[in-house]
């Protein structure tokens, strides 16, 4: 009997979240999960996702924020690209990773928790959303975050478009640093010209 790809992903996620807690470090778990994502994409003839450091930063920040929230069987969600992901303090989390909404609006943030007392958590709804989006060729990169207790998992999917690249925005950098630098340079030139006028 053939096993469906959805069941394969569901099984792998269940095993991963059930077994990794006492054995794997967060980094090992994130790397393993990333490998599972790419094996799945290869099985449906899609290119591998590339690791995106900024998406990983954001996933880690979201996980840190979720870490103290209670986890139930129904906890978890997926953002809709182009909308506010509904994560408290989201603008602050973006700023910590030197990102802004212009470079994240086409991406997707998936979050799920697996209660510690469940040996095989029910991840079917998360697996359905994850599988649907892993099948989407517009997603080209990812970042994964897992909390230190192994309860929360956040996956950030990125695109290769300006609106979903999760790249450190040059406009953002110029917006703050460039404005200050330009203002200081303008004041310097103005003061230099003022001094030469009075000499």
UniProtKB/Swiss-Prot annotation:
One of its GO terms (biological process) is cellular response to hypoxia. Keywords: Cell membrane, Glycoprotein, GPI-anchor, Lipoprotein, Membrane, Signal. Belongs to the UPF0277 family. Its main location: membrane. Residues 1-25 form the signal peptide. This is Uncharacterized GPI-anchored protein At5g19240. A lipid is attached at residue 169 (GPI-anchor amidated serine). Residues 170-199 form a propeptide. It is found in: Cell membrane. GO terms for cellular component: plasma membrane; plastid; side of membrane. InterPro entries: At5g19230-like. PANTHER family: GPI-ANCHORED PROTEIN, OS07G0645000 PROTEIN. The keyword Membrane applies. Glycans are attached at residues 45, 73, 102, 135. Disulfide bonds: none annotated. It is a lipid-anchor; GPI-anchor.
